[in-house]
């Protein structure tokens, strides 16, 4: 996702409303609906300044979730249920072996959603690159972190982003494919993108990469990106149509 304008805040300044340290919660393997309800509770409390910003670190049992731009043709062909989420984007899958991080962050005014997403991307690009994945970056028009086509594979997404802003507080967040299966993606059109692939860090690096291996580097990178210590840079290696542009929102 490329910003069509300069961000509202200088790149080296924090996008957070508070300078207090972010509180980290490690939730382990947790049901999607339970985590969603918990996010909503925390987002309300954060909007009321009752708690500091939060990072929820977790994995989900296998589940499909559909963002507000999901189309009928995106839906699974294997008969598994889908949870309709209030985040942006289209359909995706979550499951064991995928690191999920939900930042519950009160954003500084004026709220810049595009800059927030790009800072999340920057953090994930840093983490994936530091792991040794060559060329990881952006495809303009598509959010997330991508690996260029290689060894007969097409351009492939290794990390996804889907967010919601409510009362100035961000919720939902990011998912990094570590050592999860890719089988469940075969039954949907992931993120509404039919002409690209999915990958995992384990596949890219040809070794097992656990969720736990990514936790601390991801926490540091997200904290740095939101604070402006890690500055958004140009990591684009391609461009493609935005898969959500001009699509109707689910009511």
UniProtKB/Swiss-Prot annotation:
One of its GO terms (molecular function) is lipoyl(octanoyl) transferase activity. InterPro entries: aa-tRNA-synth_II/BPL/LPL (IPR045864), BPL_LPL_catalytic (IPR004143), Octanoyltransferase (IPR000544), Octanoyltransferase_CS (IPR020605). It catalyses: octanoyl-[ACP] + L-lysyl-[protein] = N(6)-octanoyl-L-lysyl-[protein] + holo-[ACP] + H(+). Pathway: Protein modification; protein lipoylation via endogenous pathway; protein N(6)-(lipoyl)lysine from octanoyl-[acyl-carrier-protein]: step 1/2. GO terms for biological process: protein modification process. GO terms for cellular component: cytoplasm. It is found in: Cytoplasm. It comes from the Bacteria. The active site is at residue 191. The record marks 157 as: Lowers pKa of active site Cys. Its EC number is 2.3.1.181. Substrate binds at residues 87-94, 160-162, 173-175. Keywords: Acyltransferase, Cytoplasm, Transferase. Pfam families: LplA-B_cat. Residues 49-230 form the BPL/LPL catalytic domain. Catalyzes the transfer of endogenously produced octanoic acid from octanoyl-acyl-carrier-protein onto the lipoyl domains of lipoate-dependent enzymes. Lipoyl-ACP can also act as a substrate although octanoyl-ACP is likely to be the physiological substrate. Belongs to the LipB family. In the reaction, the free carboxyl group of octanoic acid is attached via an amide linkage to the epsilon-amino group of a specific lysine residue of lipoyl domains of lipoate-dependent enzymes. PANTHER family: LIPOYLTRANSFERASE 2, MITOCHONDRIAL-RELATED, OCTANOYLTRANSFERASE. This is Octanoyltransferase. It comes from Corynebacterium glutamicum (strain ATCC 13032 / DSM 20300 / JCM 1318 / BCRC 11384 / CCUG 27702 / LMG 3730 / NBRC 12168 / NCIMB 10025 / NRRL B-2784 / 534). The lineage of its organism: Bacteria, Bacillati, Actinomycetota, Actinomycetes, Mycobacteriales.
